């Protein structure tokens, strides 16, 4: 594993050059913002959740995003199919357990999906990650009520059980597998006031996973790119509304100098 400003910039250029197709089965709230962020970083988004076409879509995609934000029975069936096909084709699956712990149905659905087809990467906030391991943990909607540090032991358990890279997002992003750990400290507090930026991070990570076979590197690079863009974008905005627009512009124009001057990462 090698994660630094040079490798991050290398992968940003690779995403821009290769424009990987990222297949998203995601929620209604974030479809537009997620697609725009993927376009801004240089990837090609597709939002397809019809059970009748997900196998074909996964076949041509570079990676798969499963985001359970707005659950329905039909979407869950499509998620099962898409994950099985991606696993069969050895394509990265990036899973976002939105609101895990909020309701029994939501938590059980997540556990069934990842038990049947373990994902390559799981990205969630600390409450969501802990809810997948500990009974009785409650989340407040999709917002975390726990510190990211408190979820590290739960993340280690999940990684061991499913063989996945686990990303606990927060003010500091903790990324680990069974052998490696990295901490990303980029971002800005105002990013929490823009709905869907966590879900967007999951999709951006999937773009990097499509071009880098190291899931640890891909996760760290994706989270760092999001955080750096958020930091720069927040410098000259009045509030969350203008941040959302400026974030996309910054992600699009992110430069090698930006990466080298802003990256805060500890491996």
UniProtKB/Swiss-Prot annotation:
Pathway involvement of the protein, from the record: Cofactor biosynthesis; thiamine diphosphate biosynthesis; 4-methyl-5-(2-phosphoethyl)-thiazole from 5-(2-hydroxyethyl)-4-methylthiazole: step 1/1
Domain of life assignment: Bacteria
Keywords from the named record: ATP-binding, Kinase, Magnesium, Metal-binding, Nucleotide-binding, Thiamine biosynthesis, Transferase
Stored NCBIfam families: PRK09355.1, thiM
Protein name: Hydroxyethylthiazole kinase
Alphabetical list of InterPro entries matching this protein: Hyethyz_kinase, Ribokinase-like
GO biological process assignments: thiamine biosynthetic process; thiamine diphosphate biosynthetic process
Catalysed conversion reaction: 5-(2-hydroxyethyl)-4-methylthiazole + ATP = 4-methyl-5-(2-phosphooxyethyl)-thiazole + ADP + H(+)
SUPFAM superfamilies: Ribokinase-like
Residues the record lists as binding ATP: 123, 169
Family statement drawn from the similarity comment of this UniProt entry: Belongs to the Thz kinase family.
Purpose of the protein: Catalyzes the phosphorylation of the hydroxyl group of 4-methyl-5-beta-hydroxyethylthiazole (THZ).
Class of enzymatic activity (EC top level): transferase
Pfam families found in the cross-reference section: HK
Annotated HAMAP family: Thz_kinase
Needed co-factor(s): Mg(2+)
Gene, per the UniProt record: thiM
Annotated substrate binding sites: 47, 196
UniProt GO molecular function: ATP binding; hydroxyethylthiazole kinase activity; magnesium ion binding
E.C. number: 2.7.1.50
